[in-house]
């Protein structure tokens, strides 16, 4: 009798993706983050679903409905903080996943990579929409400032902003549509993730050496299912530690004050995982220039396959490019710190230098380093 998992139409798909999938035998822990992102997405959808059962998207009751969830709903506080801190861990895994893709040259699978960039943009949009929903001070002013950036677009800007707001300011219509979009977008993310996996399984996984590994592959199960399970245990442990011991560590105290259009907070800033992009936005004095820099800070990832000049795929044997990669990591940490600081000296100039360095590494230094390393191979 033939094995049902290899012949049943539905089970065959699952088998080919998660059980008998031929996987390089040498992929490291950095390859765990894909499955961890899937776990984060499931956690976010489930906790979000239970929150949506009690949340009301009305400016008069949104803030009190979140308070009601925390005080009166069974384990509501836990669901709320699992959702909020789950978003932070989602972005930790996302940035680690992208970092691994850059370090080991995974971006040369351009279809998989471009779907990944699209996934990043969709996830960032979803997180921004979700941050507005509790309708605290930072929610309201964050929504006002970020949506207002679209007014920098020539000719259509003002009309576009009012169309998104559903009026002449951020109000009930804005909150309702943000809730609707925040609810639907995780399902779009799920669909995109499936396309991401589809393209990945067309080519097979990359590996730390950046070499073709067809001669040395092992089945995904049990080897990598166990490895992913170990990563999942650590992820859940971290999430529970954050949620149960330090629930507000990554949040903003201003969001415990109900939204007040008449009182602007002294420092408007987004969640920590957007601070690097916010710092790049603020580092350019011109409004339209800032918006373009903000968008390009993410879209520059889509250019990586075109900017690859090295004869080697991975950075494993490229010391010059390795130095630039870790310089980029340090630069992103600096930008994240600057994004949370007030707009004053010396933070302005540090932000401008860090923003310039960010784009220079991607557009100039990395391609040049690749060419130098090619030349060094001939010596």
Swiss-Prot record:
Matches recorded under InterPro entries: Cyt_b/b6_C (IPR005798), Cyt_b/b6_C_sf (IPR036150), Cyt_b/b6_N (IPR005797), Cytb/b6-like_sf (IPR027387), Cytochrome_b (IPR030689), Cytochrome_b_C_euk/bac (IPR048260), Cytochrome_b_N_euk/bac (IPR048259), Di-haem_cyt_TM (IPR016174)
Cofactor: heme b
Keyword set includes Glycosyltransferase: no
Transmembrane segments: 33-53, 77-98, 113-133, 178-198, 226-246, 288-308, 320-340, 347-367
Annotated positions binding heme b b566: 97, 196
Binding site for heme b b562: 83, 182
GO molecular-function terms, A-Z: metal ion binding; ubiquinol-cytochrome-c reductase activity
Gene Ontology process terms (BP): mitochondrial electron transport, ubiquinol to cytochrome c
Cofactor binding, per record: Binds 2 heme b groups non-covalently.
Coiled coil: none
Topological relation to the membrane, as annotated: Multi-pass membrane protein
Amino-acid positions noted as binding a ubiquinone in the UniProt annotation, renumbered to this chain: 201
Subcellular location as annotated: Mitochondrion inner membrane
GO cellular component: mitochondrial inner membrane; respiratory chain complex III
UniProt KW keywords: Electron transport, Heme, Iron, Membrane, Metal-binding, Mitochondrion, Mitochondrion inner membrane, Respiratory chain, Transmembrane, Transmembrane helix, Transport, Ubiquinone
Gene3D superfamilies xref list: Cytochrome Bc1 Complex, Chain C
Function: Component of the ubiquinol-cytochrome c reductase complex (complex III or cytochrome b-c1 complex) that is part of the mitochondrial respiratory chain. The b-c1 complex mediates electron transfer from ubiquinol to cytochrome c. Contributes to the generation of a proton gradient across the mitochondrial membrane that is then used for ATP synthesis.
Sequence similarity: Belongs to the cytochrome b family.
Note: Heme 1 (or BL or b562) is low-potential and absorbs at about 562 nm, and heme 2 (or BH or b566) is high-potential and absorbs at about 566 nm.
Assembly description: The cytochrome bc1 complex contains 11 subunits: 3 respiratory subunits (MT-CYB, CYC1 and UQCRFS1), 2 core proteins (UQCRC1 and UQCRC2) and 6 low-molecular weight proteins (UQCRH/QCR6, UQCRB/QCR7, UQCRQ/QCR8, UQCR10/QCR9, UQCR11/QCR10 and a cleavage product of UQCRFS1). This cytochrome bc1 complex then forms a dimer.
Protein name: Cytochrome b
Native source organism of the sequence: Procavia capensis
Lineage per the UniProt record: Eukaryota, Metazoa, Chordata, Craniata, Vertebrata
């Amino acid at each position: 009798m033939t094995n049902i998992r290899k012949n049943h139409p539905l089970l065959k798909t699952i088998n080919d993706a998660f059980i008998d999938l031929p996987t390089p035998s040498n992929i490291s822990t950095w390859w765990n983050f894909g499955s961890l992102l899937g776990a984060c997405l499931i956690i976010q959808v489930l906790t979000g679903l239970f929150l949506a059962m009690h949340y009301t998207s009305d400016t008069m009751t949104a803030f009190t409905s979140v308070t009601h969830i925390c005080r009166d709903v069974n384990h509501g506080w836990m669901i709320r903080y699992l959702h909020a801190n789950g978003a932070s861990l989602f972005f930790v895994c996302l940035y680690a996943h992208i970092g691994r893709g850059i370090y080991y040259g995974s971006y040369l699978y351009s279809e998989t990579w471009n779907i990944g960039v699209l996934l990043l943009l969709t996830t960032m949009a979803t997180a921004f929409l979700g941050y507005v929903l509790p309708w605290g001070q930072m929610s309201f002013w964050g929504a006002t400032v970020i949506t207002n950036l679209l007014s920098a677009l020539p000719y259509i800007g003002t009309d576009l902003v009012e169309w998104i707001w559903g009026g002449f300011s951020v109000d009930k219509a804005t909150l309702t549509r943000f809730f609707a979009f925040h609810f639907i977008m995780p399902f779009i993310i799920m669909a995109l993730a499936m396309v991401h996996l589809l393209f990945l399984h067309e080519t097979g996984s990359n590996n730390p050496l950046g070499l073709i590994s067809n001669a040395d592959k092992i089945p995904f199960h049990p080897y990598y299912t166990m490895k992913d399970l170990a990563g999942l245990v650590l992820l859940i442990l971290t999430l529970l530690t954050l949620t149960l011991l330090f629930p507000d560590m990554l949040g903003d105290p201003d969001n415990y004050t109900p939204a007040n259009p008449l009182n602007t907070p002294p420092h408007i800033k987004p969640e920590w995982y957007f601070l690097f992009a916010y710092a790049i936005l603020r580092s350019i004095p011109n409004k339209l220039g800032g918006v373009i820099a903000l968008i390009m800070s993410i879209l520059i990832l889509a250019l990586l396959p075109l900017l690859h000049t090295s004869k080697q795929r991975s950075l494993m044997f490229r010391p010059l490019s390795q130095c630039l990669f870790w310089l980029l990591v340090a630069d992103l940490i600096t930008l994240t710190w600057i994004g949370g600081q007030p707009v004053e000296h010396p933070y302005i100039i540090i932000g401008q230098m860090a923003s310039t360095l960010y784009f220079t590494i991607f557009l100039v230094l990395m391609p040049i380093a690749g060419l130098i390393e090619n030349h060094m191979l001939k010596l």
